Regions:
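Active-site nucleophile/metal-coordination loop of metallo-enzymes that catalyze phosphate/sulfate
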Residues: 1-16
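Formylglycine-dependent
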Residues: 15-51, 58-143, 149-158, 167
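Residue-level detector of short coil/turn "hinge" positions at structural boundaries
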Residues: 9-10, 52, 77, 173
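Extended hydrophobic/aromatic segments used for targeting, binding, or gating
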Residues: 87-90, 161-185
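Short, well-ordered amphipathic alpha-helical segments that serve as non-catalytic structural scaffolds
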Residues: 128, 185-187
Length: 187
C-alpha cells in the first residue's frame, strides 16, 4: 500500500487480514469500508500515457474489495497477480498449485505454458515480465513494470537450479531451500 500511494507504511494503517478488520489494504474507489482510499501510482502513470504492467504478487487489499484486482489499480497488463500474498506452490511439476479438482485462491493463475517444465515460479514470472515489455518497446511507449516475485514467501520450496551448491556448502535442507529461492530472485 505504501508503494502504491507514496505514503509511509505505518501511516497507512494497513494490516491486510480480513475485510471487516481495519485497515485492509487500499482502494482505488472511495467509500469502501476498512480501506485506505488513494489514487494508485499505476493509475496516475496510466493516465499520463504509460503502459502499466504488473507481474507476480498483488497483495494490496482484501478479497472482494476493488484494490484486490491489479486492473482496478491502473494496470493494463496483469500476469498472475491476485489477492493472494503467497503461492500454493513454486513448482511447475505441481502446476503452481492448480489442480483439476477445485479452484484455490493461492494457485498461481495463467502460467499453464510452464506446467511440468521444471521451471521454478520465480523464473517463470521473470520470463513473462520480459515478454510483457515487447509491446511497449516495439511501439515506443513509455512503460511502468511492477515486478513483485512471490519468493521468498512461504511455502519455502527450492529453486532446483541453485539448491545443490548450498547443500554442498554444508547448509541444512531448510537453509539451502531458502537460499536457493533468494538466488532465484537475484538472478
Amino acid at each position: 500500500v505504501a508503494m502504491e500511494t507514496g505514503q509511509i507504511e505505518e501511516n497507512t494503517g494497513d494490516r491486510l487480514i480480513r475485510p471487516e478488520w481495519n485497515i485492509n489494504g487500499m482502494s482505488p474507489a472511495p467509500g469502501v469500508a476498512h480501506t485506505q482510499y488513494a489514487t494508485p501510482l499505476p493509475q496516475l502513470l496510466k493516465d499520463a500515457g504509460y503502459f502499466t504492467i504488473h507481474v507476480g504478487k498483488a497483495h494490496w487489499a482484501s478479497a472482494g474489495t476493488p484494490g484486490a484486482s491489479p486492473y482496478n489499480m491502473g494496470f493494463v497488463v496483469n500476469v498472475s497477480g491476485n489477492v493472494a500474498g503467497m503461492p500454493r506452490s513454486y513448482q511447475s511439476e505441481e502446476n503452481y498449485g492448480n489442480t483439476p479438482e477445485k479452484w484455490n485462491m493461492l494457485a498461481v493463475q495463467n502460467m499453464t505454458e510452464y506446467y511440468g517444465t521444471g521451471v521454478h515460479l520465480t523464473e517463470a514470472l521473470t520470463r513473462e515480465a520480459l515478454k510483457t515489455l515487447e509491446y511497449p518497446i516495439r511501439h515506443g511507449e513509455p512503460f511502468f513494470l511492477y515486478m513483485a516475485h512471490y519468493a521468498t514467501h512461504t511455502p519455502i520450496q527450492p529453486d532446483k537450479r541453485f539448491i545443490q551448491k548450498y547443500l554442498d556448502a554444508g547448509m541444512d535442507k531448510g537453509q539451502a531451500r531458502y537460499a536457493s529461492m533468494v538466488e532465484g530472485v537475484d538472478k
